């Protein structure tokens, strides 16, 4: 081996309780089927509370009314979040019409939530509607398998409407990788789709009987766009094209953003370059990365179980050589690639296939009929006449894809009539938040409900300093798990307590640098005071084309994070 690994390949010790739960679950069945019929509680009990995550669901409750219900001696208002498996974010208009109807008829909130994992979520599914939602998805060719917990999650793919052939090829690989890494257990089909039990022994040749040590995230990236934020993910296939045709991938492994407040064994980390591989080795390499993490990942401490920590413990070269051994290949040197941005191009883009693509800005991905802006109805009306597909982006926006010239005016009119094409600032387009309150059980501070008014105030600061058309990549996440991807933002707010955030600065526009904590546990007025001063300096002192994050590093306002395992907390 080219490198002496700094730590053991396998962490010995008492396994975490999650490992017991998986082992005893009979390949993810548990007693979910029996629990479904228990009408005494609106939730799932015991291990099933965690097992349903493997089936794409999280048990939540409405935290706005939690105390009130407790005072009335009532259990929390339990309801499920369901996340669909949608590799590359592509969804047909028939599928869209089905999910629109389910959201309206069978969820507490009536909304569809686009996520930065390039799929949609339903919030507020009561227990009685859990089986029907899986059956509805199945009826239109969708499922929620492996969109949560210790598996390979929804596979992302750059939403590139212009280079249509390259997008089509990359999207096919995203689907193939997703299918190849799915669990083989029949538990999902038996419990939700009433498929009969087959008298065979379940086996998981890739994931293993106890699945992965922790969640695992995969992307297919088409430079120069980094819209999927590759450095937030465990395994990334960067598309390398020749004459507009896909020929292979650069592989980057070990990105991840979640941390725990005050736990210095946790840190955000960018992914490491392993090398280039021709297309025919893609699935073998994907499997080799996953099985190496399966066997070497830390199963004693879930806070230290992700691929990024395995790489730091055993060494990048050791991990890479094991992947080569398992896949039966040698990586070629990394091929040149560069990123120039990661935002979506809002509005119409004409593809090289002569079709039009309309990217609609959906603030925080929340699709609902608002007063004067019936977004949900508008998208439903478009879905009824559009002959192409919809594509959800990793920025929580929606593309009406493959619109022929003859349909363009009709679709634009529907979009305008329903408030889907209202003008918004560049700053708003480049701001994003996770869901957080009231449904997320992990939320420490507001995010989705906080961001719109906070963005108003940041826009006012930009205006005050004479740069109203500028933008700063800004992210708010309600807790340090980091679903809002604040740890790749130029301005990242991480929830600490109600009304309080840690302010991180020094990321860059293209998402290749981790920001550092600038101020801890501060309120909105304190954050705005700091930003007012710093944005004022940026407006006056920046170099041509210099983004806010790059300026804060160059001006010495923040020290860049160079080696997160060692200097993230400094």
Swiss-Prot record:
Its EC number is 1.8.1.2. One of its GO terms (biological process) is hydrogen sulfide biosynthetic process. One of its GO terms (molecular function) is sulfite reductase (ferredoxin) activity. PROSITE patterns: NIR_SIR. It catalyses: hydrogen sulfide + 3 NADP(+) + 3 H2O = sulfite + 3 NADPH + 4 H(+). Keywords: 4Fe-4S, Amino-acid biosynthesis, Cysteine biosynthesis, Heme, Iron, Iron-sulfur, Metal-binding, NADP, Oxidoreductase. Its cofactor is siroheme; [4Fe-4S] cluster. The keyword Amino-acid biosynthesis applies. Pathway: Sulfur metabolism; hydrogen sulfide biosynthesis; hydrogen sulfide from sulfite (NADPH route): step 1/1. Siroheme binds at residue 483. [4Fe-4S] cluster binds at residues 434, 440, 479, 483. One of its GO terms (cellular component) is sulfite reductase complex (NADPH). The keyword Transferase does not apply. Binds 1 siroheme per subunit. Binds 1 [4Fe-4S] cluster per subunit. Alpha(8)-beta(8). The alpha component is a flavoprotein, the beta component is a hemoprotein. Belongs to the nitrite and sulfite reductase 4Fe-4S domain family. Component of the sulfite reductase complex that catalyzes the 6-electron reduction of sulfite to sulfide. This is one of several activities required for the biosynthesis of L-cysteine from sulfate. This is Sulfite reductase [NADPH] hemoprotein beta-component. It comes from Salmonella paratyphi C (strain RKS4594).
